[in-house]
UniProtKB/Swiss-Prot annotation:
HAMAP family: L3_methyltr_PrmB. Methylates large ribosomal subunit protein uL3 on a specific glutamine residue. It comes from the Bacteria. The gene is prmB. InterPro entries: DNA_methylase_N6_adenine_CS, HemK-like, Ribosome_uL3_MTase, SAM-dependent_MTases_sf, Small_mtfrase_dom. Keywords: Methyltransferase, S-adenosyl-L-methionine, Transferase. This is Ribosomal protein uL3 glutamine methyltransferase. It holds the Pfam family MTS. The keyword Transmembrane helix does not apply. Belongs to the protein N5-glutamine methyltransferase family. PrmB subfamily.
Length: 299
C-alpha cells in the first residue's frame, strides 16, 4: 500500500485522505494532542512539510515533490504501524500557546492544570504577584513549571522529578524559554530532601491503577511507565503528596493535584479532607485544590 500511495498520490489533499483512511484502518488511539484521525493527519502532514499548523486550506491542492511525499508518507506509516504518538514523531507537544520538546523519556504533556494557572486559582491566590516560590512535583517535560513562570512573573520555581531522563528533557525546554535563572531542576522523589516552602505546589503525578496500566492502548506503551502507574489503586504518589505537602506550604499556600479518574477512590480514602474540585475542559473531577489549613485540619 505504501508503494502504491507513493506512486499515485500527488497533492496534500490526496495524502490527507490517504492518512485518515490509514489511521482508521489501523485502529489508532488518539489522546496525545488530537482526538481524531483527521486532525492527527493534518498535524503530521503540515509539521513534516514545515507549513503553518493553522493554515491547511491554502495548501490542500499543492503538489508534493517526490522527496516531500516520501517523507510525509514515512511519518504516516510509522504512526499507523508502530502506534507512536504524534508528539514523539514530531518531538513537539502543545499546551495552549506553549509548545514543548518531547521524546519518549517523558509523557506527552496533557495535564489540565495549565488551564487553571492564573485566573483559575482565584480567590485562593488573589494576585499572581503573591506567588514568590512555587514547586512542580513530577515535572516531566517541565511544561507546568514553564507555564507557572509565565503566569507568576515574580516566582522562583523548583521542578522535581525522580527520573534523570525526564529532567534532561525539562532542561531543554527551560533553556528554550530562557528560564534557567527562574526554574531549578531537582532530582529527587517527590519532597525527599527539599528544604524550602512554597506559595503554590502543583503536581500531575502518576495516577493510573495497576489494572488500567495493563489495558492501556498501545500508544501509551511508548511513554515511560514510571510516569503512568501508581500502585494498585493509582494513588500511591498522591498519598505521599497529601501526607507531606503541608510541611512545604507557606501559611496561605495552595496545593493543586491532578488525579485522572480517581476522584471517587480518593474521596473514599480521605473523607476528612474538603477537596475543592476545579472545572477544566475535561470536567470537574480531575484536579483538586487544598489549602495548607485544610491539609492540617485547621479549616
Amino acid at each position: 500500500m505504501f508503494n502504491q500511495a507513493a506512486q499515485e498520490l500527488t497533492t496534500i489533499r490526496d495524502v490527507l485522505r490517504f492518512a485518515v483512511s490509514r489511521f482508521n484502518e489501523a485502529g489508532l488511539f488518539f489522546g496525545h494532542g488530537t482526538d481524531n484521525a483527521h486532525d492527527e493527519a493534518v498535524y503530521l502532514i503540515l509539521h513534516t512539510l514545515n507549513l503553518p499548523l493553522d493554515m491547511l486550506a491554502p495548501y490542500l491542492d499543492a503538489k508534493l515533490l517526490e522527496a516531500e511525499k516520501e517523507e510525509v508518507l514515512a511519518v504516516i506509516e510509522r504512526r499507523a504501524v508502530e502506534h507512536i504518538p504524534a508528539a514523539y514523531l514530531t518531538h513537539q507537544a502543545w499546551q495552549g500557546e506553549f509548545d514543548f520538546y518531547v521524546d519518549e523519556r517523558v509523557i506527552v504533556p496533557r495535564s489540565f492544570i495549565y488551564e487553571l494557572l492564573g485566573d483559575g486559582l482565584r480567590p485562593w491566590i488573589e494576585y499572581d504577584e503573591l506567588v514568590h516560590n512555587a514547586l512542580d512535583l513530577c515535572t516531566g517535560s517541565g511544561c507546568l513549571a514553564i507555564q507557572m513562570a509565565h503566569h507568576y512573573p515574580d516566582a522562583q520555581i523548583d521542578a522535581v522529578d525522580v527520573s534523570l531522563d525526564a529532567l534532561e528533557v525539562a532542561g531543554i525546554n527551560i533553556e528554550d524559554y530562557g528560564l534557567e535563572e527562574r526554574i531549578q531542576l531537582i532530582h529527587t522523589d517527590l519532597f525527599e530532601g527539599l528544604e524550602g516552602t512554597y506559595d503554590l505546589i502543583v503536581s500531575n503525578p502518576p495516577y493510573v491503577d495497576a489494572e488500567s496500566v495493563g489495558a492501556l492502548p498501545e500508544e501509551y506503551l511508548h511513554e515511560p511507565e514510571l510516569a503512568l502507574g501508581s500502585g494498585a489503586d493509582g494513588l500511591d504518589a498522591t498519598r505521599q503528596i497529601l501526607l507531606n505537602a503541608a510541611k512545604f506550604l507557606n501559611p496561605k499556600g495552595v496545593l493543586l493535584v491532578e488525579i485522572g479518574h480517581n476522584r471517587d477512590v480518593l474521596e473514599a480514602a480521605y473523607p476528612e479532607l474538603p477537596f475543592t474540585w476545579l472545572e477544566t475542559s475535561g470536567g470537574d473531577g480531575f484536579v483538586f485544590l487544598l489549602t495548607r489549613e485544610q491539609l492540617l485540619g485547621e479549616e
